[in-house]
Amino acid sequence: MNTLDFLDKKSLRDDIPEFRPGDTLNVHVKVIEGSKERVQVFKGVVIRRQGGGVRETFTVRKVSFGVGVERTFPVHSPNLAQIEVVTRGDVRRAKLYYLRDLRGKAAKIKEKR
């Protein structure tokens, strides 16, 4: 094991569910405004997952009021309160960048049986 991996192991979270690109997630994000802290839910489709260890990130895409919104989260961030898998998607790619060009029903992902 690499020395950096040994040091990073303490920072890894163990409450992260198994998810892949194509899955629909509810990501509960801690938002700090002044002295108040609240949890905001970001629901969307995972379009990529990259990196490894502490530096692993994933990007979630949703369409809000006709505008595509993408947000990238570090998997092991302390600002993530919870990650829920809503549905499992059936896709053949690891990076779903092609969803950016699709609109309406064409942008839907089949649900895995």
From Swiss-Prot:
SUPFAM superfamilies to which the protein is assigned, alphabetical: Translation proteins SH3-like domain (SSF50104)
Keyword hit for Mitochondrion: no
Record flagged with keyword DNA-binding: no
Keywords from the UniProt entry: Ribonucleoprotein, Ribosomal protein
Any GO BP annotation: translation
Domain of life: Bacteria
Gene Ontology cellular-component annotations: cytosolic large ribosomal subunit
Gene Ontology molecular-function annotations: structural constituent of ribosome
PROSITE patterns: RIBOSOMAL_L19 (PS01015)
UniProt xrefs under Gene3D superfamilies: 2.30.30.790
Xref: InterPro entries: Ribosomal_bL19 (IPR001857), Ribosomal_bL19_CS (IPR018257), Ribosomal_bL19_sf (IPR038657), Translation_prot_SH3-like_sf (IPR008991)
UniProt function note: This protein is located at the 30S-50S ribosomal subunit interface and may play a role in the structure and function of the aminoacyl-tRNA binding site.
Family: Belongs to the bacterial ribosomal protein bL19 family.
UniProt protein name: Large ribosomal subunit protein bL19
Gene coding for it: rplS
